């Protein structure tokens, strides 16, 4: 089976572009592909608890809703460790959002 790693690089600075990787991950998963969502650069901010609640792209579903769907589908979300540390998040991990299974977004 084909696998995809879908990369997000934009955060709250560009809500529309920040939302698109989550839409792509959801659609790819629904079409039967194995998917990983990779957050790097400014997108690592989106892994922080509560941040997605305030991100709404132009004419798009709110990121909060998409994040809930992505998590419910079990799509892994990887967060760039170096990017998170540079933005002073994720060390220790309590400020990263949790998946429904109780695992924080994985760093690779």
Segments from the language model and where they lie:
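C-terminal structural segments of small proteins and small subunits
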Residues: 87-108
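Short, flexible loop segments at the rims of nucleotide/cofactor-binding pockets, characterized by
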Residues: 53-58, 94-98
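Short internal beta-strands
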Residues: 35-40, 77-81
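N-terminal beta-loop-helix "entrance" segment that forms/cooperates
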Residues: 43-57
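A glycine-rich helix N-cap at a beta->alpha junction
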Residues: 54-81, 86
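Histidine-anchored nucleotide/phosphate-binding helix
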Residues: 18-31
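Short, glycine-rich nucleotide/cofactor-binding loops
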Residues: 5-19, 50-51
